A protein has these predicted regions:
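C-terminal helical cap(s) of enzyme catalytic domains, especially alpha/beta-barrels
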Residues: 33, 116, 128-152
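Acidic, divalent-metal-coordinating active-site segment for phosphoryl/phosphodiester hydrolysis
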Residues: 106-118
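Short Gly/Pro-enriched loop/turn and capping motifs at secondary-structure junctions
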Residues: 69-71, 106-109, 129-130
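Conserved, mostly hydrophobic/aromatic
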Residues: 8, 63, 88, 104, ...
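A short hydrophobic/small-residue beta-strand
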Residues: 15, 40, 122-123, 129
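Electropositive phosphate-/nucleotide-binding environments in soluble metabolic enzymes
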Residues: 2, 78, 82, 109, ...
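Conserved anion-binding
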Residues: 3-7, 13-100
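Expand to "…catalyze enediolate/carbanion chemistry for C-C bond making/breaking, isomerization
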Residues: 24, 28-31, 96, 108, ...
Length: 152
């Protein structure tokens, strides 16, 4: 992935997200992203234990919890990922860290609200928004569902 960092930075990317499943490459990739002056995101796939991200939490700006297996849109939300979001939020509070928690995959009004209650801050929604006839209304409804789930 590092071959794309500089072109993305030059194109105006503010943040670059790498997968924790890259293992021993993670520290050097984080460093390369930071050298470019960009925010660092770390993604975790559904089958990977949340503990895999623990060594990097103080080095990242965003934790992206994948709530579907990456590869194609329209998949159903994997509810077993909710405890990962809860744990990530607990660690953020316990360690006084400031990374954002984002979720990607199967996000609907219902699952978005569930993720918000679990501690997610941002939501990546595809099919539930772009598969509707009225995008503006769908976005408004998702925002309302999330904000009602966790009054801030």
């Amino acid at each position: 992935p590092e071959i794309l960092f500089e072109p993305f930075a030059k194109a105006g990317a503010d943040e670059m997200i790498i997968h924790v499943e890259l293992g021993e490459q993670i520290p050097s990739l984080i460093k390369e992203i930071k050298v470019l002056g960009k925010e660092v995101g770390l993604a975790i796939n559904p089958p990977t234990a949340i503990a895999a991200v623990l060594p990097y939490l103080d080095q990242i700006d965003l934790l992206l919890v994948m709530t579907v297996n990456p590869g194609f849109g329209g998949q159903e939300f994997i509810r077993e990922c909710l405890p990962k979001i809860q744990q990530a939020a607990a660690w953020r509070n316990e360690k006084a860290l400031s990374y954002r928690i984002s979720v990607d995959g199967g996000i609907t009004n219902e699952t978005g609200a569930d993720c918000a209650r679990a501690g997610a801050d941002t939501f990546v929604a595809g099919t539930s928004l772009f598969g509707t006839r009225n995008l503006k209304s769908a976005v408004t409804q998702l925002r309302q569902s999330v904000s009602e789930a966790v009054p801030r």
